[in-house]
Structure formats: C-alpha cells, structure tokens
Amino acid sequence: MGVIEFLLALAQDMILAAIPAVGFAMVFNVPVRALRWCALLGAIGHGSRMILMTSGLNIEWSTFMASMLVGTIGIQWSRWYLAHPKVFTVAAVIPMFPGISAYTAMISAVKISQLGYSEPLMITLLTNFLTASSIVGALSIGLSIPGLWLYRKRPRV
C-alpha cells in the first residue's frame, strides 16, 4: 500500500468514524456546541487506532492506546470548553466498539444451541468473544487511565 492510498484510507476511516460519534453524542444529549468536537475526537481515536494497526500492533493494544489518546485529549478539551470530559470521550470511543466480533460470537452461540456442539463453532465463539471482551476492556481502561494520571493530587514520586 502506497502513501497516497494509505492517506486516502485513513481519511475515509476518520470521516466514517466521525458520523457515529456525532450520532451517539446526539443520543446522549451532548450540547450542540460540542458535537463537532465529538466528531473530531471520534475521528482522531479511530484514525490513531488504524495507524497503530497498520504499523503492526494488534487490535486490542491499538484500541487501548487510541482510547488513552481520546481520554487525554478529552480532558484537555474539557478544561478549554468548561465541560465534563465524558461529554467528548464517551461518544468518541463508540465507533471503536467491537460489533463484528461480538455479533460473530453471538451467532456462533446460537448455532451451537441449534445444531449442537462442534469444535469449529466453539473455536469461533471463544475467539470472537475473547477478542470483543479484550477490546471493551481496553476501551474502558484506556479511557480511565488519563483521568487517574492527570487528576492525581499526590506527587507521583
């Protein structure tokens, strides 16, 4: 993949990630003045995850690093715009949730209940379930760590 193709794929990924970020921000009743920042933060988070995955990191660690970046930027923006950090960060990480692997795990569970146990179905179920669980854990821990670091009252040493 050349540089131009990568930049076009990155721009497409970021634009398509901004759309659900704004949609979920509207569902969560985020103020209108903050919607564009939710879209930008969702695009930054998903784009950074794509860059990390392209550079060779797996999806779990890429999601963890991207959610830490989203949390850090959200805390900084909350200071600038006098809003709670969750206004920006929660809607921004929604596009990174593992819908495909969770859906595949659920379909495998339904097939096992209908057709009975088979080893390929069980492998598919466990692989996708563990991937989805790891990504959700990476999102939640990655969002909470910047708050623990930046709001710390005691000295670090």
UniProtKB/Swiss-Prot annotation:
GO biological process: succinate transport
Chain segments annotated as transmembrane: 8-28, 50-70, 87-107, 129-149
Keywords: Cell inner membrane, Cell membrane, Membrane, Transmembrane, Transmembrane helix, Transport
Source species, domain of life: Bacteria
Membrane topology: Multi-pass membrane protein
Signal peptide bounds: none
Binding partners and assembly: The transporter is composed of YjjB and YjjP.
Protein name: Probable succinate transporter subunit YjjB
Organism listed in the record: Escherichia coli O1:K1 / APEC
